[in-house]
Structure formats: structure tokens, C-alpha cells
Amino acid sequence: MGQTVTTPLSLTLDHWKDVERTAHNQSVEIRKRRWVTLCSAEWPTFNVGWPRDGTFNPDIITQVKIKVFSSGPHGHPDQVPYIVTWEALAADPPPWVKPFVHPKPPPLLLPPSAPSLPPEPPFPTPPQSSLYPALTSPLNTKPRPQVLPDSGGPLIDLLTEDPPPYRDPGPSSSDGNGGSGEVAPTEGAPDSSPMVSRLRGRREPPVADSTTSQAFPLRQGGNGQFQYWPFSSSDLYNWKNNNPSFSEDPAKLTALIESVLLTHQPTWDDCQQLLGTLLTGEEKQRVLLEARKAVRGEDGRPTQLPNDINDAFPLERPDWDYNTQRGRNHLVHYRQLLLAGLQNAGRSPTNLAKVKGITQGPNESPSAFLERLKEAYRRYTPYDPEDPGQETNVAMSFIWQSAPDIGRKLERLEDLKSKTLGDLVREAEKIFNKRETPEEREERIRRETEEKEERRRAEDEQREKERDRRRHREMSKLLATVISGQRQDRQGGERRRPQLDHDQCAYCKEKGHWARDCPKKPRGPRGPRPQASLLTLDD
């Protein structure tokens, strides 16, 4: 109890510093999270036997590498650094990898004696496309030991096996019929030529899911010597027609050229051929200019010394011998500068309006939108969206340029300033996944419309009732006022003329005199009655 199972994947994660060092030696950069995702989720889907826990089996790694380097839509150029690092760990294993590395089978120098090869028939029939006539010898001819495989049999793979040795020149056999001398051209001459090997390889059935070249420009053989194989015209044609131009999508074409530089290890002439095929004349001049700007001096800073620039990145064919370590170092440095020139020349002038124009589509997932947004940052700005210092700017662009419903909910998140870009993407994914379907949206709109109509009818009825009640109250008040006035008029009319005696004063109500003779009534001239002042239009 308490024991844990060690797998190749967990082993690489425990020694991640060594893995990064191996990747740096291959001139590539890798990330731990992407490493785990490819090993446990992506490569097992290639159906080549890759386990989810990883493996150091070179055969399985080669199959995955073929899938990754496939040209066209089936390739995965973004996975090149990771499979190259896996291959480097298996080819040159550190001490902690050696217990997990599968032992290499011994090289087969005598293919006829291998159990996988069929026995040679007594009267072999020549292949249909053979370049040499098939010569048969009599049955009583002494059998001659063969070093190279039969021309009709399977060939040794130039990628996975060491090249077969050439046949030592020696005296001809002492057979009287001279049959061996007749057979020698058939057995030795065709196999000793790389071109014949290529022509014979074309007669073999094609390997499934392999659309990239299997003959790399520089390939080290078993004797330590490098073999040179130039690019084939079909590879150059496929690379040019299955990828956008450098002006349309510089990032994609740069990734393709980077994978070619890492895996094929081209020479100076091959690099010029590759650039001349994939780039226009103006684009090539821009790339070369940016590459020469990237040359650094002894102090590690970009230099302006013409001699240092020409030594590191010459414009004319240099005398670099790839069979020497010094020549290979020059080629590695040249390819690194060329890659830097491609990256710098692919950067467009800063145009933040282009970045702000990237908005999330109606049915686009937040992850896909974030990738398009990062690509716009790489293409139209000098900023790296993967830089931690630019995470805040990318996060704000992600919020403001998301779909309206997602952006509003992201803006209302609590403690928004402390949220990382990954947190925002996860929240956006939750909101995106909870979106209603078109049918649900139509049903919701119909239900809301019905509820709105019902509320409007109820409000109209309520207003009508309130208006009727108010009118009824006003009429009631008016009737009450009229009735009370009539009552007052009747009562007032009766009290208006009180009964007086014949000798009673109407003014002081005393008897003995009348009102005109009342001593209490004031005497004097009557003044004019005050007249009400009226306003005229002039006032």
C-alpha cells in the first residue's frame, strides 16, 4: 500500500528540467500542460499504439511523428516540438529514461537469412518496372552468398535501419560458366545507387498516412558519415499548394518552414531552394534582411559589423562541409537565424483596430475565440499574448469582444481584477454551455409575448375601472353639492323676510319708529360704490 506506478509520462514530469534541456538542445520550446495533453489525449487518437501514459518505444514514436509531419489538413505542425523531444529522449536517453527504453534489435546485414524475408526462388521473375534485365543461371551453379537483398524483395528502410555496406571488390568466382560475373550487375549495380533505391522504393506499396518525404537532406548512417538527399519536387509542390502564402498567413507558413528546418536539417542550398519555392522575391528579401539583423556579436547584442554578419548569415554559397562538426554548427546557426528572420518579417505593422475587430461569433466557443484573438495579437501587434505581462490586456479584450450575453455576465463577476485569463475562459465556457437552443429561445419569446399581452389587458381593465370609479365619485360629489344648495336656498328663503310689527324698526328692531327714522342708523351722504378695476389688453 502507498506505492505509486511510474509511467513514462510521470517520469518526464518528475524530471521536467531535463526534458526542457533536451528540447532546448533541439532548438524548440515546450510547455508542461501541452506536453500532458498531447501524451494523454491527442496522440492516443492517432491509432498507432501510443498509450495514454506515454512510451519510449522508437517504433511507436516514429509512427506518431509521421502523423504529426503529414502535410495538408491532416498534419499537426504545432506538435512538432513535442514529438521531436520525445524522439530525442528515446534516442539519447538520460539515466532516468534508460530503464524504460526498449532495446534496439541488431541490424540485419544479411537480409536473405532473416526469417521475415521469403526464400529466393530458383527461377525468379523480374519485376514489371525493373531497370535491369533479369539473368538466370543454371541450376547446377554454385550458390553465391548475397550481401544485399534481392531486387524483388523488400528494401531496408533508410530511416529506421543503417544503410547496408557496399560489396567488397574481390576476384571473380572460379566458376567455369562465368555465371557469377553475369549476375553481379543485377545484384550490385542497382542497389549501390541511391537513385535506383528510390526507383525501387516507388514500386513498394505506399505507407498509410505518410504524405511527407522520408528522405531527409542530411541523415547520419551507421558509419558516422552523413548522407545527403535533396528535397523532392513533389514535396516542394505539396508544401506550396497546401499552405497559404507568407503574406496571407505568415504564422502558418513559418510553422511549416520551422518543422522542415528541424526535421530535414537542410543545407544552405536547400534553404535557398525552400525559400525560393515558398516565398516571393520580395518576401524572401524581407526575410533575409530580418535574419541578418538578428545576427549577434560577441557581446550577445545585435551587431552591425559586415564581417560578422556575412560569416553567420552569408548571402552567397559558403564552403560549409556538413561532414565536419564545424560545418554542422554553421548550418544550425544559419537555420536559427533564418527562423528568426521569418518570425520578424511576418509581423505586420501595429494595428490595434484589427485586434478590436475580432469578435466572438454567435456559435463560436470561447476557446476558439481566444485563439483567434491571440493570433490577431501576434499578427497585428508586436506583443506576445503568451507573455504574462500582456495577460491583462488580452483578458480585457476577451471580455469586451465576447458575445454580448457572455461579456455582460463576465463584467458582473465578483473580484474581476484577481481573475486570470484561464478563469475567465472557464466562466465563459459555463455561460456558453448554458445557452438556450433556438427552439427554447423561440418558446421563451412566445411565452414572454403572451405574458406581456396578458399584463397589458389587465392594466387596461384596471385603468378603465379606476376611471369609472373616479367619474362616479365626481358625479356623486356634484349631486351632493346641488342637493345641499337647494336645501339652503329653501331654508334661506324662509328666513329672508322676518315678521315685523307695524311700529317696529327694521334696522335696530326696536319699536316706536321706523328704519328711516332710526337714530342708530348713520347719517350722511352716501359715497360712491367702489368699482372693480378691469385689466385691458394694453396692460
Curated annotation (Swiss-Prot):
Q: Enumerate the InterPro entries for this protein.
A: G_retro_matrix (IPR000840), G_retro_matrix_sf (IPR036946), Gag_p12 (IPR002079), Gag_P30 (IPR003036), Retrov_capsid_N (IPR008919), Retroviral_Gag-Pol_poly (IPR050462), Retrovr_matrix (IPR010999), Znf_CCHC (IPR001878)
Residues of the region (Disordered) are 111-222, 435-539
In its UniProt record, a GO molecular function of this protein is: zinc ion binding
Q: Give the GO cellular component terms, alphabetically.
A: host cell plasma membrane; host multivesicular body; membrane; viral nucleocapsid
Post-translational modifications? RNA-binding phosphoprotein p12 is phosphorylated on serine residues.
Which SUPFAM superfamilies has this protein been placed in? Retroviral matrix proteins (SSF47836), Retrovirus capsid protein, N-terminal core domain (SSF47943), Retrovirus zinc finger-like domains (SSF57756)
The record's PANTHER family line, in alphabetical order, gives: GAG_P30 DOMAIN-CONTAINING PROTEIN (PTHR33166)
Q: Where does the record place the region Interaction with host UBE2I?
A: 431-436
One of the GO BP terms on file: viral budding via host ESCRT complex
Region Interaction with host PIAS4, as annotated, extends over: 346-394
Q: Which positions does the site annotation Cleavage cover?
A: Y132, P133, F216, P217, L479, A480
Motif stretch (PPXY motif): 163-166
Q: What is this protein called?
A: Gag polyprotein
